[in-house]
């Protein structure tokens, strides 16, 4: 069991930007199409974080052309180039799945003043 933990520790990213549920973030993802590699940006609200260590993942939700789009990203994947925090949100829940049923201003998160 100790060997597994040691290998997992080697695979963890050291430069992960700290963020929480409710924050609006930009996830810069490396996309390989054919032989070319480019960066694709996915901006939205973090509605959930789960797991720990190498298994840690987070879910980001945005509204694109009137449709809700959610994407789950593993935190320590090499496909993520960087994560930028756009706004810090003030929420009282660990999971914001209730945002799925809300549209427009009703789905907005209050900005945090001190975080």
From Swiss-Prot:
Q: Which family does it belong to?
A: Belongs to the bacterial ribosomal protein bL19 family.
Q: Where are the transmembrane segments?
A: none
Record's GO cellular component terms: cytosolic large ribosomal subunit
Q: Which Gene3D superfamilies match?
A: 2.30.30.790
- Keyword annotations of the record: Ribonucleoprotein, Ribosomal protein
Q: List the SUPFAM superfamilies.
A: Translation proteins SH3-like domain
- Answer whether the UniProt record assigns the keyword Transmembrane to this protein: no
Name by which UniProt lists this protein: Large ribosomal subunit protein bL19
Which PANTHER family does the entry link to?
A: LARGE RIBOSOMAL SUBUNIT PROTEIN BL19M, RIBOSOMAL PROTEIN L19
Q: Which domain of life is it from?
A: Bacteria
Q: Which GO molecular function terms does the record list?
A: structural constituent of ribosome
Q: What does the UniProt function comment say about this protein?
A: This protein is located at the 30S-50S ribosomal subunit interface and may play a role in the structure and function of the aminoacyl-tRNA binding site.
Does the record bear Phosphoprotein in its keywords? no
Q: Which Pfam families match?
A: Ribosomal_L19 (PF01245)
In Gene Ontology terms, what is a biological process of this protein? translation
Q: Cite the InterPro entries for this sequence.
A: Ribosomal_bL19, Ribosomal_bL19_sf, Translation_prot_SH3-like_sf
């Amino acid at each position: 069991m100790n060997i597994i933990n040691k290998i997992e520790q080697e695979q963890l990213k050291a430069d992960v930007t700290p963020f929480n549920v409710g924050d609006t973030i930009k996830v810069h993802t490396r996309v390989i199409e054919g032989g070319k590699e480019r960066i694709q940006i996915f901006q939205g609200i973090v509605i959930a974080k789960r797991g720990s260590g190498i298994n840690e993942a987070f879910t980001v939700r945005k509204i694109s052309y009137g449709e809700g789009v959610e994407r789950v990203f593993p935190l320590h994947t090499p496909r993520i180039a960087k994560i930028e925090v756009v706004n810090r949100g003030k929420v009282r829940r660990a999971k914001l799945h209730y945002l799925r049923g809300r549209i427009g201003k009703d789905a907005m998160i209050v900005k945090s003043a001190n975080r």
